[in-house]
Amino acid sequence: MSTSKPDNALPRLEASVSRREFLVRLGVTGALIAGSGLATRRLWQPDHFVPGFQEEKGLQLKNYALEASKVLPSMAIAHGLDHEKTVRAAMAALGGMGRFIQKGDVVMIKPNVAFDRPPALAATTHPDALRAVAKLVLEAGASKVIIADNPINSPTGCFFKSGLSAVASEMNLELMYPESNSFSPLSLNGEILKNWTFFHQPFKQATKVIGLSPCKDHNLCHSSMTMKNWYGLLGGRRNQFHQHIHSIVSDFALMMKPTLVILDGMNVLMSNGPTGGRLSDVKPMNTVVAGTDMVAVDAYGYTHLLERDLAELTYIHKAHDRGLGNKNWKDALYKEVQA
């Protein structure tokens, strides 16, 4: 990560700024004592605290994970040809959605909607996967379902093109777009991630969190699955983490303790990820993996869905070595079923 010093000059406030401009040029309300070098508040930048201002500790996310079961599987693998039936089979094998969601829960589902791509290209969470998971969550008694992501491309365009906004409208789910006031500073004692702006708004209401991600190739870190999915919660100039991509992805297993993760491997983007662009890059694998250990789920996804050697996936080994999950997924209690 760059160590260059930021400009200490205050950014000019405008009547209307975009979300990304806001995160880069966040202003401070309140007076500064001109020329004295003193300030009443510190300036928050997305990648660092500005020198000369008092450093303030950011928030820490709550742990949404449930206590591990000694008798129920921690991972389930389902194979089938129908999206909803395969999702349901995976969740039934895991003990049912009722194991994770109780009546009255507010459930935040984090899909991967980074790009404005249609579902057929497998670069984003498939609308059929979202529909299936949301149905199960509502059937389990959730009072509200929030869908949220911070896409690279236009949020409205990404949710529309991916088909997820249509599902949200159809099922009366709350679709929460990132706005300038949706972000808060996050503090984490990560290998790379220390202090950063974070899409915190959906977590203010959530009592349970589910990660729902596609399984796809990624040109920088080999793959994007359940761990990499949390990258979409960061604000600011997050592309500067690309030079430490495996470290930042392993940090997400420290940052996020979700209730459940679901890896959609019905159609896998085998090459030219993360954006894709050709139907020939997509291979039907007809598999859904659900579990409580992101590291284990991704280890299965990399070897059995992307069909690659796990030895090359550095972020999995980093997370495993840090005790954030188990890359040896067969060591866990798991169940494999046919939908």
PLM ranges: what are they?
Residues 2-339:
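N-terminal and secondary-structure boundary signal
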